């Protein structure tokens, strides 16, 4: 039910170049293709939403709400996002364990305790969804 595209697994503001146009702004460049593969483009929401959740939860909500309003989402969107958030959480957790001996904010935090808020984040949008059955 999705159009395969390039999924970066690290799509976030810091890896994009945005250009002003007459119609507003558009992404004109992307960096960091090291983990890129073909897949479901929705997978790239997880890294940016996760970053916003850590830095500014209100911005995460605004980003997610705007995405849902602007893009017709397919049935199963919430469940897929939970899996994508789990996968991204595993990647981030593994990186920090290997390179710093734990998460910068708290090296004693267990994975489940740290990852659960990210994995469950999309639950709040279950009743606000605009479904596209196509």
Whereabouts are the PLM-identified features?
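Glycine-rich, phosphate-binding/catalytic loops in enzymes
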Residues: 23-25, 46-48, 109-110
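ATP/Mg2+ or Mg2+-diphosphate-binding catalytic cores
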Residues: 65, 92-134
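Active-site acidic catalytic loop and adjacent metal/ATP-binding pocket
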Residues: 1-43
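Alpha-helical scaffolds flanking conserved acidic
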Residues: 77-84
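Active-site activation/catalytic loop segments of kinase-like enzymes and analogous catalytic loops
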Residues: 42-73, 85-103
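A structural signal for well-ordered alpha-helical scaffolds and beta->alpha junctions
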Residues: 4, 56-64, 74, 108-115
């Amino acid at each position: 039910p999705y159009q395969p595209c390039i999924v970066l697994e690290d799509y976030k503001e810091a890896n994009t170049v945005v250009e002003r146009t007459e119609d507003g702004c558009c992404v004109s460049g992307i960096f960091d293709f090291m983990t890129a593969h073909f897949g479901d483009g929705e997978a790239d929401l997880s890294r940016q939403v996760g970053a916003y959740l850590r830095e500014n939860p209100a911005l995460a909500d605004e980003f997610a709400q705007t995405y849902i309003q602007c893009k017709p989402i397919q049935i199963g969107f919430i469940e897929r996002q939970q899996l994508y958030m789990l996968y991204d959480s595993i990647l981030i957790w593994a990186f920090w364990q290997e390179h710093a001996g734990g998460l910068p904010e708290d090296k004693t935090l267990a994975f489940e305790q740290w990852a659960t808020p990210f994995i469950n984040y999309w639950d709040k949008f279950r009743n606000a969804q605009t479904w596209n059955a196509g």
